[in-house]
Amino acid sequence: MNGTNRPTEPLSIAFYTSMLAFLTTIGVVGFLLFMAIWQYTTVGKVIIEILLSLIAFIGLFWNVYFSVSSIMKCFIPKKAFQTNTKYCSVIPENKPKHAEWMDVTIQIPVYKESLQEVLMPTLKSCMVARDHYVKNSGAKCNIVLCDDGMMVYLKNNFAAAEMMWETIEATKGKYFKLSQLLQKIPKPSRRHLKGLSSHAVYEVFHRMLYYYHYNIGFVARSTFDRRGKFKKASNCNSHLRLSWGAEQLSEADGISFEEALIENSHNSDGSRFIMFGGDVSIGELQLINDADARMSESVIIKTVPEFLNDKHLGFTQHATKTLDDQRRESYYINMLSSYTDALYMGHFLLSSILGCHPPLVGHSIILRSEAIKSCGRIRTLRKAQRWLNNIGLPFLSVDQIGSYNLQDNGSTEYWSECHVSEDFELMIHLYNLGFNGRYVNYPDCEFQEGITRTFDEEAGRHRKFALGAHELMFNSFNNWLGKGPFTPLFSTFLRSDIPSYYKIYLTSYMFGYTSGGCYILVFSIAAIARLCDVQQEIGFLSAFNSAGVLALSVIIYYVIGYTTFLFAMIKMKFSNNNLLFPEYRDHGVIYLCWRLIRYCMYFQILFYSVMGNYFFLGSMDHLMSRPNICGATNKDSIKITRCIAFCDMVRFNTGSWAIAFYLLVLAYLTVLKDADWKFDQWPNDMLGTFLFAGPAAFLALSAFYVPIILNPYILGWPFNPPLCGKKRQAEKKKNKGGKQVVDLGTFMAQTDSKLNKEIGRAENKPDVELGSLATNDFGRSNMTTATPFTNYHKTAPRKRPEGARPNQLTHAEKQRSRREANGNGASQRFTLAMI
């Protein structure tokens, strides 16, 4: 007996919404083509009109769908907000009586984020959720960090990593100072640290110490051969290949899982390519979390019954809001946090209730492990078939290729490493394989994520989204002749058994990133045709009206869009107030509407007036096979001056400003053309010229001032300057006596206080190269004290010149340090003082 009574079919509104939007778009494009033929004057004008009409389909598809779906969301019945629907869960389900709880693995890909500022708060929330699930279910739940920064710090020195981790395990993590730990290491083994930065060694030591104390597994791969445009996919794959490969090896050879892990982490020549520690096994479910994201205590135990009741459920996407610590950090954070809340609390939730499949955004998700394995086998099969086609062999079935070859974990891509939007690509694969997704918005079970702090970072993310959307749909230009315009993945998606209304929804959503750049292309064609029209044969173009496009966008997004969205949010508040985030739940309707209009709409007006340039750049990055220049989002706090922020802004917006300057030149040339190329006269048809060139000039000018307005590090005072990442020291609680209960929070507070103190001490030391460790190690033979440099500090201090700083070396000490460095590779005393 299942613990669910959700409907088996989505609401019928979704079908009517998609069909109406698609037919409306076809009707508008057909009308434009009819007008082009009906108003025939010259062959050139007809060709231009037809070309612009076909391009207009891409731009209109998302706009029409957005306006139609916004109106339809107002007709969602009240009952849908109070019960679970096919693709949305607002009430936790009950576990089936005879079903067993599933093992869960929390996987967190990290790089070089700050342990104290970013990783610790995230891991604390994960540990609380882990222990809550284990205590109440009896099942297994482990945390694994895919640490891509560890080997970067250690310069791919696996011997040093093994030495430090094995010593931490042997000493049971009781040494919080690196100098104390290194005393337990034999002198010949310390040579592995030679040439490493002292700060890098400190960072790795603190990470390993934290992982050990809180029973957190970690996987650190080699810095060589890290495939993928963005390393998150290959980082997660390294953990999946290691664990699942060890499981297969353990079953095949009859060895233990730990022995299989060690064998699977080494190359055939005995060299190591991946480091691991702790429990790195993978459960039946995987929770993917970002390095700067927090989760609620009960989110796992409330979500697992969803997978137990539906064997076709491949993933759940959870509602996510902005970090509480980051809210109100600056005026930009206020606007972006309101926009993020509206996205997850409004559009994603309403679309899922409406009947559309939820998106998979890459974090705050729970995935079924078997579904990920199926996607990996499909990718391997396609690679094998492409290889057979290249050498001229016919198509072979899975049985002929061999199931074992499809499970070669040394090269299987469970997450796509050749796509920028690996999460979106995985979602399409899951839908093609027959798995469903579900949007989960349990009350008080929201995830929290960090958001970007500047316009440049957010614009870079949207440029990456545009690149990923085009990568999924279209081949690059150099492959069009041989493979056609559409990718095999997108063609398979269109031919799959997925309901047609969802194909329309997903296609229109991806075309939304194309429509932003369509205006630049369409305006360029119309303006160049107008400039080359010497005989005045083209005249007015029915397929393109610059002012009409701008007015249509304003009407769709800010009149129809916000009117219907606010109506749907008000209806949801009165139907089920618990669906709103806590920041909006305790306030009235006026506060909800005012905050969404004040921050969210104002942000969209400014932000998306410039995003067309970045959508165009992202599409050209893929279509012209250009290397992507957008990096990962910075998760650490930013502390920079106004001058540095301005220079970074100029450097990032060079491409956008080039497009803006190009649009300004075209607009100005059309004005001169209408004025008979006379600089001191206005055009005869002033209104027509302004309606054609004015919107393009407005969008071009926006590209210059919006990046400055939306950057709080440039404006600063009086616009609520951002907090510059000041570290908050934990308050020491006084023990007032009584019975002391040692729980997880107390244990973490005690351990964190020691580790935080040691991290602060290490950060205040200068960064030096550990060069003397190969010969002199850390101490002499007569050193028996707790720290390896005690004898050095016990020597009588030399008399310093009057007025010298406390840490300033005298001339004689500098000479002696140079002599020791020349004789032993580096100054032993100087190196020991750094440690």
Language model features: what each stretch is:
Residues 1-89:
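Hydrophobic transmembrane helical bundles of polytopic secretory-pathway membrane proteins
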Residues 2-22, 107-119, 486-515, 593-597, ...:
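Loop-to-transmembrane boundary segments
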Residues 29-52, 505-623, 648-733, 738-749:
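Membrane-embedded multi-pass helical conduit in multi-pass membrane proteins
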Residues 61, 65-495:
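Internal catalytic domains of large membrane-associated glycosyltransferases
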Residues 90-134, 145, 603-614, 741-760, ...:
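Acidic, Ser/Thr-rich low-complexity segments on the non-lumenal side of membrane proteins
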Residues 136, 613-641:
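Membrane-interface alpha-helices
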Residues 137, 146-158, 162, 634-682:
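A membrane-cytosol interface segment of integral membrane proteins
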Residues 190-194, 734-835:
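Intrinsically disordered, low-complexity cytosolic terminal tails
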